[in-house]
Amino acid sequence: MLNQVSVLIVEDEPFIALDLATAVEEARGKVIGPAGSVREARMLIEQHLVQAAVLDVNLSDRDVTPIAELLIKDGVPVIFYSGLALPVALRERYPSASAYTKPTPPVELLNKLVALMLK
């Protein structure tokens, strides 16, 4: 399904991050991360070619907005994945953003990522 696409996972809950990483690998994608903070995510973005991303909204150090802005500016398909609804500020800034609440099955997220990459 993913054919070696590099997917950045930004998620601070270890079990959820593991589920996402496993799903990416099973779909024949390459996992970048997971990153549990904005700082970690920035380092990974500097070190790797990110072709798609699944972003938790609230991380251990702050919200994911700086990472989302960086990736979206570069045309990287992004899915927000949060325990809560997407914050108003992010929804207003990115009205067409794909946002899912936990516990959406990882395969559903990956199907949406593939659809976004084909646009």
Please tell me what each predicted stretch does:
Residues 34-52:
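Acidic, metal-coordinating helix/loop segments flanking the phosphotransfer/catalytic sites
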Residues 11:
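Conserved acidic carboxylate
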Residues 14-33:
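Two-component/phosphorelay signaling modules centered on CheY-like receiver
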Residues 56:
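Active-site residues of response regulator receiver
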Residues 66, 73, 84-102, 107-111:
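Alpha4 helix (beta4-alpha4-beta5 surface) of REC/receiver domains from two-component response regulators
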Residues 1-6, 39, 91, 101-119:
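Non-catalytic signal-transmission and effector/linker regions of two-component phosphorelay proteins
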Residues 60:
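The feature encodes the CheY-like receiver
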Residues 79-81:
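Hydrophobic/aromatic residues positioned on beta-strands within the core alpha/beta folds
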